[in-house]
Amino acid sequence: NLMRRQPVCAITPANPNPQPIFQELYISIDELRKSVVPDFDLLSNLWLFRHLTQTLDLRMLQVLIHNDDSTIDSSISINLNVKTILSPEFINFDNSLKASSRGTVVVELQPIDIFSDMGAYMFARDFMRERGYRIALDGLNHQILQFIDREHLGFDLLKLFWSPEMADDNSGTRLAELKEHVDRCGRARLIVARCDSDEAVRFGQSLGSTVYQGRYID
């Protein structure tokens, strides 16, 4: 079983202990590589990797459709390709959910996927909104964030990947610009992910974020 879970948690000044909001379900690419093709870099060919993730999407949906684990019936996020959302398999998954559960499911999308076919994304977005899902844009760094108009694109959440270079800013200019972009997108809409240290959380707090994900949070 290559499926993994990682909580997305709220951390506030009033309550510094992480409070789970939902959990991300994902298939570990690294574990898959080690077990199937240990000598091959799955990330070396972007389009091959996307094809692989589409296959893994379908596997994940099948697991969720047939699961008997009540802990993953709701309050989850799953990372899918736009093509998967437009597939019969996603319709089957949608039909398997209770109506009340859909609003607790976050569908995460990658920038390269949505911007490679905006028409398909907008169709998928409108369908997901109609069905009650929340939508997150995953895989953002501090350089990409400035170009994202969250409301116009129709995302409920943005996931910003922490990296130490984000804090390497002696002048404070980068932090000020990043805070401006975060304020524009909405502080409550931001998840600071890949938090592997206390520094990551402190930096997120300097942006006004209260939602975090990563090994340090675990």
Q: Where in this protein do the model-derived segments appear?
A:
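Short, solvent-exposed linear motifs at loop/edge-of-secondary-structure regions
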Residues: A99-F115
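Structural preference for beta-strand elements that scaffold enzyme active sites
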Residues: F22-E24, S75-N79, T104-E108, G132-A136, ...
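Bacterial c-di-GMP phosphodiesterase EAL domain
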Residues: N1-A99
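EAL-family c-di-GMP phosphodiesterase catalytic domain
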Residues: N1, Q6-P7, I29-L32, Q110-I114, ...
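Catalytic-core regions built around general acid/base machinery
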Residues: F93-S100, F123-R131, E177-V182
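Acidic-and-aromatic substrate-binding clefts and catalytic sites of carbohydrate-active enzymes
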Residues: Q54, K83-E89, D113-D117, E165-D169
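Flexible, charged surface loops at secondary-structure boundaries
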Residues: H66-I72, A99-S101, R129-E130, E151-G154, ...
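Distinct, well-ordered alpha-helical segments
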Residues: L86-K98, D117-R125, I144-L157, G204
